[in-house]
């Protein structure tokens, strides 16, 4: 989102059950795309419910496991949608095969982000936008 959304969006990443470190294949994939991983760290989504947290307009959950989880009460009432993807960390095989799974999910997420960015956000009311984002999560 930070690369595709230019200056229109600032994206953050967090999880319900963060690991101690970013997955090594995630780092490798991002490095392959010349994305700086130096400032990235694994973090809990609870960091984004604190008073000093950045204001969120949209929150997309992406892990197939979070679909049934109780999400935090996000401050500011952002629009939320679930875009379920397979967890590439669960892929089995050689490192190359596993990296291919990470790459596939990276591309799938990128495709959804491109569609999101193509929506006429300033012309859609909140309910219409919510429907669009929910529908996007089904495809």
Question: Where on the chain are the PLM-derived regions?
Answer:
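Alpha-helix C-terminal capping/helix-to-coil transition sites in glycosyltransferase folds
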Residues: 54-55
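Structural signal for conserved beta-strand scaffold positions within catalytic alpha/beta enzyme cores
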Residues: 13, 61, 81-84
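Generic detector of well-ordered secondary structure
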Residues: 3, 32, 62, 110-111
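Conserved active-site segments centered on acidic
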Residues: 1-49
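Phosphate-binding/catalytic loops
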Residues: 70-139
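Short amphipathic alpha-helices and their capping/turn segments at secondary-structure boundaries
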Residues: 48-51, 69
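Short glycine-rich anion-binding loops that position phosphate/pyrophosphate groups of nucleotides
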Residues: 64-67
């Amino acid at each position: 989102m930070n690369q595709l959304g230019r200056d229109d969006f600032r994206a953050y990443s967090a999880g319900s059950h963060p690991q101690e470190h970013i997955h090594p294949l995630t780092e490798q994939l991002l490095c392959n795309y010349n994305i700086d991983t130096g400032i990235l760290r694994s973090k809990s989504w609870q960091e984004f419910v604190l008073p000093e947290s950045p204001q969120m307009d949209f929150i997309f959950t992406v892990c197939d496991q979070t679909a049934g989880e109780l999400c935090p009460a996000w401050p500011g009432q952002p629009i939320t949608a679930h875009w379920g993807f397979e967890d590439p960390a669960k892929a089995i095989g050689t490192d190359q095969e596993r990296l291919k799974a990470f790459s596939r999910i990276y591309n799938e997420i990128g495709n959804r982000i491109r569609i999101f960015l193509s929506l006429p956000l300033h012309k859609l009311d909140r309910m219409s936008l919510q429907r669009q984002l929910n529908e996007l999560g089904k495809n």
